[in-house]
Amino acid sequence: MLVVFVATWSDLGLCKKRPKPGGWNTGGSRYPGQGSPGGNRYPPQGGGGWGQPHGGGWGQPHGGGWGQPHGGGWGQPHGGGWGQGGGTHNQWHKPSKPKTSMKHMAGAAAAGAVVGGLGGYMLGSAMSRPLIHFGNDYEDRYYRENMYRYPNQVYYRPVDQYSNQNNFVHDCVNITIKQHTVTTTTKGENFTETDVKMMERVVEQMCITQYEKESQAYYQRGSSMVLFSSPPVILLISFLIFLIVG
């Protein structure tokens, strides 16, 4: 009985050691592409499948499919299709630059800049047209209906060129109405006496506002100059510069 058990156990051990023919990872069919030269490999070499270096499928460097560098399909650098180096439509059409209109140029001009051809006058920033009552319903209604035709910016010179507010406002009103009238008349629109009367009132209010704004800025600049020109401040600044440089 013991001899039979030993013989059976030895026979089972020899069966496990014997190589099995065929099957995965044997000499017949291997993955990926290993084993005998005649086996079936994936990916196959020298064939014509997808992604191969010498085939004719999609994306191959020497094939003729879409997107290949030497093919003839769309978007290829040496092909003859649309957008290719050898094609007739190899560049996008560049859009023409938009023309800059006078309206855009005027809108881009900074408020307070010196206006050329007006002898040193500056153009103030845009304002909301004031609500003015003229004493009767007709003129009040006329103003509300036509206020968009009147100026919303004024021309002025620096406040330090005038001795008082009245002179500033008088000059501001005259030059603003003159410029606005000339510009509007050139466009083929005329003003009536009522228009001129209302423009004088509107522009006068805006010129007063502009004077107050410019006067405040002028005095602030003057105060800053006086502050920094005082001897204690100059001494302090000099000491700080000495500490930084030294």
Swiss-Prot record:
Main localization of the protein described in the UniProt heading: membrane
Membrane topology: Lipid-anchor; GPI-anchor
GO CC annotation terms, alphabetical: Golgi apparatus; plasma membrane; side of membrane
GO biological process: protein homooligomerization
Keywords assigned: Amyloid, Cell membrane, Copper, Disulfide bond, Glycoprotein, Golgi apparatus, GPI-anchor, Lipoprotein, Membrane, Metal-binding, Prion, Repeat, Signal, Zinc
Region called 5 X 8 AA tandem repeats of P-H-G-G-G-W-G-Q, residue ranges: 44-84
Binding locations of Cu(2+) 2: 62-64
InterPro entries referenced in this protein's UniProt entry, alphabetically: Prion, Prion/Doppel_b-ribbon_dom_sf, Prion/Doppel_prot_b-ribbon_dom, Prion_copper_b_octapeptide, Prion_N
Sites of GPI-anchor amidated serine lipidation: 223
PROSITE patterns given in the database record: PRION_1, PRION_2
Location of the region described as Interaction with GRB2, ERI3 and SYN1 in the Swiss-Prot/TrEMBL record: 16-223
Disulfide-bond pairs as recorded: 172-207
Keyword Cytoplasm: no
Binding positions for Cu(2+) 4 per the UniProt entry: 78-80
Residues annotated as signal peptide: 1-15
Biased composition (Gly residues): 45-88
Record's subcellular location: Cell membrane; Golgi apparatus
Binding-site list for Cu(2+) 1: 54-56
Compositionally biased residues, Basic residues: 91-100
Residue segments, region Disordered: 18-100
Record carries keyword Glycoprotein: yes
Disease the record associates with this protein: PrP is found in high quantity in the brain of humans and animals infected with the degenerative neurological diseases kuru, Creutzfeldt-Jakob disease (CJD), Gerstmann-Straussler syndrome (GSS), scrapie, bovine spongiform encephalopathy (BSE), transmissible mink encephalopathy (TME), etc.
Annotated family: Belongs to the prion family.
Descriptive protein name: Major prion protein
